[in-house]
């Protein structure tokens, strides 16, 4: 009788534990796949086999800096810079050949139309290349050469204005006037290209990267609940009473 009662209590405890498992434990929530779209500038971690988290190898590029750079029409500005550089090289060569002993032209003696024209051509070519190939290296190279072109145009304008005061050669003054107009134009073009290049570089530097842990878990094992120990029994044997005859 005691053995039957102990077995009944053990079965009732097991049924109670099973009912708690059925009502208390919930299935894991649905997890979205990692192939869903992510906004630019977000890098997601993946868990390796050893449990360590490692970032993905690729990151979506941020196109906002390049859009800022393209607002300034770098291809058109670069084309004009190349033409101005060619004009400087051509007019400088003509002045060098026909000056006929007219000394005192610092613009020619210092080779301003040659190194200035070469600088204008290089900066214009890099601006056109940066619009065709959207790379950070070309963007920074275009920015650096445009800064140099602006400095060269400013120095060339100052030298041309100085030559106007010391040159009495009428033909030379005509060439200097044309070169002054194109040099001032190159200065403003280089400043505009530098402005948009600085904005694009600043936007590229300030682009934030957000690190998100991987949404997948590697262990879906549900811990088994603790089973209560069976009840204690007294060491008393039940002896049925013999029936009297």
Curated annotation (Swiss-Prot):
It comes from the Eukaryota. It is a multi-pass membrane protein. InterPro entries: CD20-like (IPR007237), MS4A (IPR030417). It is found in: Membrane. Residues 1-30 are annotated as: Disordered. The chain crosses the membrane at residues 78-98, 103-123, 147-167, 176-196. Its main location: membrane. GO terms for cellular component: membrane. Keywords: Membrane, Receptor, Transmembrane, Transmembrane helix. May be involved in signal transduction as a component of a multimeric receptor complex. Belongs to the MS4A family. This is Membrane-spanning 4-domains subfamily A member 15. It comes from Mus musculus (Mouse). The gene is Ms4a15.
